UniProtKB/Swiss-Prot annotation:
The keyword Disulfide bond does not apply. It comes from Rattus norvegicus. GO terms for biological process: cellular response to oxidative stress; determination of adult lifespan; in utero embryonic development; mitochondrial ATP synthesis coupled electron transport; mitochondrion organization; neural tube formation; neurogenesis; regulation of gene expression. Catalyzes the hydroxylation of the 5-methoxy-2-methyl-3-(all-trans-polyprenyl)benzoquinone at the C6 position and participates in the biosynthesis of ubiquinone. Catalyzes the reaction through a substrate-mediated reduction pathway, whereby NADH shuttles electrons to 5-methoxy-2-methyl-3-(all-trans-decaprenyl)benzoquinone, which then transfers the electrons to the two Fe(3+) centers. Belongs to the COQ7 family. It is a peripheral membrane protein. It is found in: Mitochondrion inner membrane. The gene is Coq7. Fe cation 2 binds at residues 90, 142, 178, 181. It holds the Pfam family COQ7. This is NADPH-dependent 3-demethoxyubiquinone 3-hydroxylase, mitochondrial.
C-alpha cells in the first residue's frame, strides 16, 4: 500500500470507530492521527467542512492544471524552473486535499472535467503572452485563492477555533504559500503583461465564478 493509501486507510478506520482524528499539515506529508479530542464526523459542521474541502480540492486541482499549461509553453525557458517550483508546491496541496477527501468522505465537484480543460487553457493561453502573461495569471489566481482561504479561516475561527485547529493550520500554511507565489509573480514582471489590469480582473472574475460553482456542485 502506498503512503497516501495507508494514511487514508488509517483515517477512515478512525472515522468508522468514532475516534476523533485531527490532521496535521507539518512537513511534506499530511499526518492524520487518532486522538481523544478534535474533529470527528459526528462533531463537525458537515455541510461547512464538506464545502471547504470540496472547493479547496477543486481550486488546487485547477491551479495544478494552470501550471501544467504554463510549463507546456514556457517549461524550456529561463522562467521554467520558477514555474516548476510553484507547481511542485501546488502538487503537494492537491495531494493533501485528496487525502482529506477520503478521510472526510467528501465527493469532488462534478465540474472537475471543466476545471481540467479550463485550467490548462488559462495557463497555456496566458503563457503564450510571454513570461509576463504567465506571471500576471499567477498573481491574479493566487491573490484570489489567498482571499478565499482567508474567508475560510475567519469562518472556522468564529465557529470553533479549537475544534478546527489543525484544519486551520492546513489552510493557513497553504494561504501563506499562495501569497509567496503571488509575490513571485510580481517579482517576475507580472505587471508588465499586456493589459495587465484588465487581464487580472478577468481572471479573478473567472476564479470567483469557479469558487461559487465548486462550493455548490
Amino acid at each position: 500500500m502506498s503512503g497516501a493509501g495507508a494514511i487514508a486507510a488509517a483515517s477512515v478506520g478512525c472515522l468508522r470507530t468514532g475516534v476523533p482524528r485531527p490532521f496535521s499539515a507539518y512537513g511534506r506529508g499530511l499526518i492524520i492521527r487518532c486522538h481523544s479530542t478534535g474533529m470527528t464526523l459526528d462533531n463537525i459542521n458537515r455541510a461547512a467542512v464538506d464545502q471547504i474541502i470540496r472547493v479547496d480540492h477543486a481550486g488546487e486541482y485547477g491551479a495544478n492544471r494552470i501550471y501544467a499549461g504554463q510549463m507546456a509553453v514556457l517549461g524550456r525557458t529561463s522562467v521554467g524552473p520558477v514555474i516548476q517550483k510553484m507547481w511542485d508546491q501546488e502538487k503537494n496541496h492537491l495531494k493533501k486535499f485528496n487525502e482529506l477527501m477520503v478521510a472526510f468522505r467528501v465527493r469532488p465537484t462534478v465540474l472537475m472535467p471543466l476545471w481540467n480543460v479550463a485550467g490548462f487553457a488559462l495557463g497555456a493561453g496566458t503563457a503564450l503572452l510571454g513570461k509576463e502573461g504567465a506571471m500576471a495569471c499567477t498573481v491574479a489566481v493566487e491573490e484570489s485563492i489567498a482571499h478565499h482561504y482567508n474567508n475560510q479561516i475567519r469562518m472556522l475561527m468564529e465557529e470553533d477555533a479549537e475544534k478546527y485547529e489543525e484544519l486551520l493550520q492546513v489552510i493557513k500554511q497553504f494561504r501563506d504559500e499562495e501569497l509567496e507565489h503571488h509575490d513571485t509573480g510580481l517579482e517576475h514582471d507580472a505587471e508588465l503583461a499586456p493589459a495587465y489590469t484588465l487581464l487580472k480582473r478577468l481572471i479573478q472574475a473567472g476564479c470567483s465564478a469557479a469558487i461559487y460553482l465548486s462550493e455548490r456542485f
